């Protein structure tokens, strides 16, 4: 069975690791899992290096993209079940926070929320961890072999009548068939267009100030 993940951001890398852990390893069926990503996934790439490559958009592999993340107890439990060493790497890259404070753009305090939660196996409370988006991505990406990530931009995904899926590439290279495709390629997802071909662009896109 061939599984293709589109996008090597946090979601794509996490999906890859989950599949590797939970897919059955016994029996006659074998699994091939490949990630296609349009941008560089080098662990140590910097924003300046990306500018030198003249790439218009940014991605998870850029040190400055996405700012910070607050990972709650439920998210930390997911990381723990996946790999305890992964959880430790993420915690070490950030800091714990017992409260989550929301403020207006003028700095006024709007609400303060308890940011602790219970673990799944014990009654011990777990604090939220605040970390950079890149450090979270880096911890996931470092556990994926380089040869399982292919740097290619996908132009179209087609669901075929025979049950297979066909992936076309922007560079015109030969198309690839896959039994299962996981779309982890962001809000302007190419994979999503294959499922909802008639869907229009978001009429109310987010506005960042």
Map each language-model feature to its residues.
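Extreme N-terminal starter segment of soluble prokaryotic enzymes
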Residues: 1-4, 31
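Active-site catalytic pocket residues across diverse enzymes, especially alpha/beta-hydrolases
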Residues: 19-24, 195, 199
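A short acidic Gly-Thr/Ser loop motif
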Residues: 7-9, 186
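Glycine-rich FAD pyrophosphate-binding loop
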Residues: 8, 20-65
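Conserved N-terminal helical subregion
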Residues: 2, 61-66, 70-209
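N-terminal Rossmann-fold NAD(P) dinucleotide-binding loop
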Residues: 12-13
């Amino acid at each position: 069975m061939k599984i293709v993940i589109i996008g090597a951001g946090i979601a794509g890398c996490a999906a890859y690791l989950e599949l590797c852990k939970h897919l059955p390893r016994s029996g006659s069926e074998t699994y091939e899992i490949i990630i296609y990503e349009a941008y560089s996934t080098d662990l140590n790439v910097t924003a300046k290096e990306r500018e030198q490559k003249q790439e218009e958009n940014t991605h998870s592999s850029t040190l400055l993209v996405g700012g910070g993340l607050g990972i709650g107890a439920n998210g930390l439990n997911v990381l723990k079940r996946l790999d305890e060493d992964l959880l430790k790497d993420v915690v070490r890259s950030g800091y714990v926070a017992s409260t989550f404070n929301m403020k207006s753009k003028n700095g006024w305090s709007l609400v303060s929320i308890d940011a602790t939660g219970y673990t799944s196996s014990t009654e011990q409370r777990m604090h939220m961890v605040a970390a950079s988006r890149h450090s979270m991505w880096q911890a996931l990406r470092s556990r994926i072999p380089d040869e399982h990530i292919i740097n290619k931009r996908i132009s179209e995904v087609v669901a075929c009548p025979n049950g297979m899926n066909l992936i076309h590439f922007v560079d015109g290279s030969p198309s690839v068939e896959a039994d299962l495709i996981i779309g982890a390629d962001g809000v302007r997802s190419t994979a999503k267009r294959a499922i909802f071909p008639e869907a229009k662009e978001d009429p109310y896109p987010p506005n960042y100030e």
